[in-house]
A protein has these predicted regions:
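Surface-exposed loop/linker segments characteristic of extracytoplasmic
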Residues: 1-139
């Protein structure tokens, strides 16, 4: 399962202060590859997600899904949920210690779950902070 990256929160206002936190698939945007000021090799495009059924918080004691059809049709996820989680709204995987992402340049990168939160949530997830990211910081 893969979902697009919506940036830190996904539905931030379209003003200059919030634009740096928008991801490629932020809500109500029409971003293109040309919109990515950070460079396509520095920007997350799609990432792995386990979906709601693997999340212990997605069901109540009687097995009823509290979130309904949580991730089906969601389109994009936020980076604000972090990586070290199994919540329905966050990027996650069964791989030991990593989650795989497709960068905007088409490269596939494994991102350590222990990555610095600022690096993941803002610098890799956003498209306009104009900061290069070292692959050493990512893997």
């Amino acid at each position: 399962n893969y979902c697009g990256v919506a940036g830190y929160w996904g539905n931030l206002p379209n003003d200059l202060n919030a634009q740096i936190y928008q991801g490629v698939f932020s809500n109500r945007t029409d971003n293109s590859l040309a919109s990515i000021e950070d460079g396509t090799s520095n920007t997350l495009l799609f990432g792995e997600t386990l979906g709601g059924r693997n999340d212990s918080e997605a069901t109540s004691g009687d097995g009823i899904y509290r979130f309904g059809q949580t991730w089906i049709g969601s389109g994009a996820f936020i980076t604000g949920g972090g990586l070290d989680t199994r919540h329905w709204y966050a990027f996650s995987s069964e791989h030991a210690g990593i989650v795989q992402f497709c960068m905007a340049d088409g490269a596939v990168r494994r991102i350590n779950r222990t990555i610095d939160e600022t690096m993941f949530k803002y610098r890799l997830g956003g498209i306009k902070d104009r900061r290069a990211v070292s692959l050493i910081d990512v893997q």
